[in-house]
């Protein structure tokens, strides 16, 4: 796969552990790529669910994917401030079709006031049993929750105000 460059549009596909397609985002604009990560933006992006329901994202969001960490981060930019939705997920892979990852159900929501909430624990436990997540995956995900919380608490990477401003401004430059 040719590495997408700044200003290119890619598709993002989220799968479940059993290999079923979970969700697809069309036309995510790439803001930056390097050997380990991709930063992009969704702005009124078409999302298709596994049951073919479709919806469009309401606000611009900076998305961050990494090849080594078991999470991805969505910084949702609203008038009242930035909030975050973090998916516990496999590191991404990129092929000719899309950026792809496995969604492991657990999510961390960070509200604009900094409050954090772990979401979908019951869904994770149900899928862990039904889809037979290996113990290694369970351990990796729990360790990555700790890394993610450290990033949040210390405003690392996508959780810094500067990060969101830099990439949101870059998006506006590219879309002209």
Swiss-Prot record:
Sample GO molecular function, one term:
magnesium ion binding
What the entry lists under SUPFAM superfamilies is as follows:
FomD-like (SSF159234)
Q: How would you classify this enzyme at the top EC level? A: hydrolase
Where in this chain does the entry annotate a coiled-coil region?
none
Q: Name what cofactor the protein needs.
A: Mg(2+)
Which Gene3D superfamilies has this protein been placed in? FomD-like (2.40.380.10)
Q: What residues bind Mg(2+) 2, as annotated?
A: 105, 107, 120, 123
Q: Which UniProt keywords apply?
A: Hydrolase, Magnesium, Metal-binding
Q: What family, per the record?
A: Belongs to the Ntdp family.
NCBIfam families, from UniProt?
PRK13662.1 (NF010183)
Designated name of the protein: Nucleoside triphosphate/diphosphate phosphatase
């Amino acid at each position: 796969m040719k590495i997408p460059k700044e200003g290119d549009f890619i598709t993002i596909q989220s799968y479940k552990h059993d290999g079923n397609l979970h969700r697809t985002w069309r036309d995510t604009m790439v803001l930056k790529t390097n050997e380990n990560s991709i930063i992009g933006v969704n702005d009124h992006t078409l999302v298709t669910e596994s049951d073919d329901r479709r919806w469009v994202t309401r606000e611009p969001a900076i998305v961050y994917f990494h090849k080594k960490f078991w999470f991805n981060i969505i910084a949702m930019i609203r008038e009242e401030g930035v909030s975050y939705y973090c998916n516990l997920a496999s590191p991404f892979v990129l092929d000719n079709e899309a950026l792809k990852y496995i969604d492991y159900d657990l999510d961390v929501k960070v509200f604009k006031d900094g409050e954090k909430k772990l979401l979908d624990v019951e869904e994770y436990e149900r899928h862990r049993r039904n889809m037979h997540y290996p113990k290694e995956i369970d351990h990796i995900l729990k360790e990555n929750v700790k890394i993610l919380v450290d990033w949040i608490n210390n405003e690392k990477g996508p959780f810094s105000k500067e990060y969101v401003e830099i990439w949101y401004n870059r998006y506006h430059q590219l879309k002209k």
